Amino acid sequence: MKKSFLLLPLSLVVLSACTSNFPAPISDADGNFSPSVIQSVNGSNVGGAWQPEIQKNSLPTTGNMVTPQQNFQPINQQPTMPTAPAQPAFQPSPKTVVSAPTVQTKTVTKTVADCVDGQHINIPRNPNTNAPDYSKISKGSYKGNTYKVNKGDTMFLIAYLAGIDVKELAALNNLSEPYNLSLGQVLKISNCDIKTVTTTVSVKQPAVTASTATPVKPAVTYTPGANGTQIGSDGTIIGPIKSEAGTSPSVPVATSSTQVTSSVNNANSTPINSNVVAPIASNVVWQWPTSGNIIQGFSSTDGGNKGIDISGSRGQAVKAAAAGRIVYAGNALRGYGNLIIIKHNDDFLSAYAHNDKILVADQQEVKAGQDIAKMGSSGTNTVKLHFEIRYKGKSVDPVRYLPRH
């Protein structure tokens, strides 16, 4: 009980010290006292409650803010470019077009007849008799394909203008003597120049598809085999093969993969001149009109031989070179002697001159190889046959149509 009374005064002293207006001194770790950092909010409010004053410091701005650096090691790595997703490889279907259509050119050479449908011509005439003045007319000056008969024209005049014989003109128009002409009548002349025309044309090649493309076969190589044979890489065997007794030797047959090239030496073959104009295609089957040697060949020059001369003996048979109809048989044309003209079709005529005797008549149908005359020397000084082939009224080389001996 005494202890309780003793402690009571001590407690009051402590309480009175805590409620004083002055803060208690604070001692630091060294035991030195220092005034308190807590100050009143308002100096006049001495009696108010004490609150600690929070000193406001402005935060640094973003620009002045120091960012702590992180410690890292740079990695040497090349930048990678973004790549597109891989596309699947294109595989063409069997019908897919592999190549586009192409255009190629090729050279075409053909023999054509250069004809003029009609031609206006002034014929110099005698003012008194209206007869043609041949001294002022050039033979063959008319180049038309047809001719319209004018007043005073004769068959001789028209043939002279066209540069052909009267009988040929009559044969072309199916006329017979005495050749009566009417004003305005149109005669077929067929005075065409035969020439070779070379042109270049474009050929469009179709597109090649996988389904239509033809695979290229590998080249066939050969190795020596037994008995002189050659064994091909494709299994074919060529060369001599010894046959067994009682059997026939097999004949090698060329397959599609083997190309057989043969060289034939013909002592009688005649070299072909590449500069000679190719013959015009003919549906007439020709044969030699007689046997013998050619003593004078064809010439296309002015004044040249318009056919071939074949030697022979008097009375030797002269035959029709092809089937046709006799359109002239006589000796009215000077320089030809006994002459026969055969019309084979609308394009081709053949002529047989200098005959000793004529065995056929005008308008007679003859067969190829039929005897039509006997060889002679009429109109010339030697026994021979002068033979001509005419295409559309123009002389062509008979040798290029006749079969080789």
Curated annotation (Swiss-Prot):
LysM domain location is 145-189
Lipidation, S-diacylglycerol cysteine type = 18
Establish whether keyword Lipoprotein is in the entry: yes
InterPro entries reported for this sequence: Cell_wall_metabolism_enzyme, Dup_hybrid_motif, LysM_dom, LysM_dom_sf, Peptidase_M23
Where does the record locate the signal sequence feature? Answer: 1-17
What is any Pfam family matched here?
LysM
Keyword set includes Signal: yes
Q: Name one GO cellular component term.
A: cell division site
Region Disordered: list its residue ranges.
Answer: 81-102
What keywords would UniProt list here?
A: Cell outer membrane, Lipoprotein, Membrane, Palmitate, Signal, Virulence
- Superkingdom of this entry's organism? Bacteria
Topologically, how does it sit relative to the membrane?
A: Lipid-anchor
Protein localization: Cell outer membrane
Entry similarity comment: Belongs to the E.coli NlpD/Haemophilus LppB family.
NCBIfam families, alphabetically?
A: PRK10871.1
> What's this protein's name?
Outer membrane antigenic lipoprotein B
* Organism name: Haemophilus influenzae (strain ATCC 51907 / DSM 11121 / KW20 / Rd)
